[in-house]
Amino acid sequence: WIAQPVRTAFNHRHSFNLEGGDNTLRYKLYFGINQAPGVMKGTGVDTKSGSIDLRYRTNKLLVSNQLSIDFTVGDRTSPYGTFQTYTMLNPYYRIYDENGAISKVLDNHVYSTDGYVSYIGGYSTPTMNPMYNIQFHQKDQNKQFQVRNSFRAEYTPIESLRISADITLTKTEEDLEQFKPSSHTDFEGLAVEDRGSYNWTHNKGT
């Protein structure tokens, strides 16, 4: 069971740089992609970044400006559930039923004697199959978009005097979206109208 929700994950990082100019004006362009899948299936972080860096220099004046943009998408929760759930399952439980479909219930923990129903081992609820939920669309995703602009100016009227000014502006937007369908095993035993969940949160910052 513990091998089912995990995978071998490799981090992929790619970048592109272009720079040039002369003694007066210099420029630098950057674009990068960082894909970091998680060990749990269906999790990971995907980041795309870009920046433009400009520098202008004369005898007494230096002006620079850097604009950077970052966009990150993170899938926080595996559709397989938590790893701890799998460590608690008995190895003899069968993932699939006799028809090859993923079983919803692994063990009811009940037996009947003379018309009376008893629970085995103190269990009062059935053990659900966490892999049953991978058949349905679900989401626990975080998206973040950030723009940052840094401006700096330096003026040196004489060799022993330097005047400088810095301005940095940052804008961030973040979305968190969480969805579980009504067929998810988390809602087993609940009334139909209480099944399923959806949550969306949007944050802005400067």
Descriptions of predicted regions:
Residues 1-17, 27-43:
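Short strand-turn segments of transmembrane beta-barrel domains in outer membranes
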Residues 6-8, 19, 42-44, 55, ...:
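Generic marker of residues within folded, mature protein domains
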Residues 17-21, 30, 53-57, 66, ...:
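Transmembrane beta-barrel domains of outer membrane proteins
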Residues 25-27, 127-128:
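Acidic/polar, low-complexity linker and loop regions
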Residues 11-14, 47-51, 147-152, 156:
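Short alpha-helical segments and helix-capping/turn motifs at coil-helix boundaries
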Residues 161:
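An active-site-proximal structural segment forming one wall of the substrate-binding cleft
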Residues 11, 22-23, 57-61, 156-158:
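Outer-membrane beta-barrel channels and translocator barrels
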Residues 1, 39-40, 49-146, 164-206:
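Surface-exposed loop/interface segments of Gram-negative outer-membrane beta-barrel transport/assembly proteins
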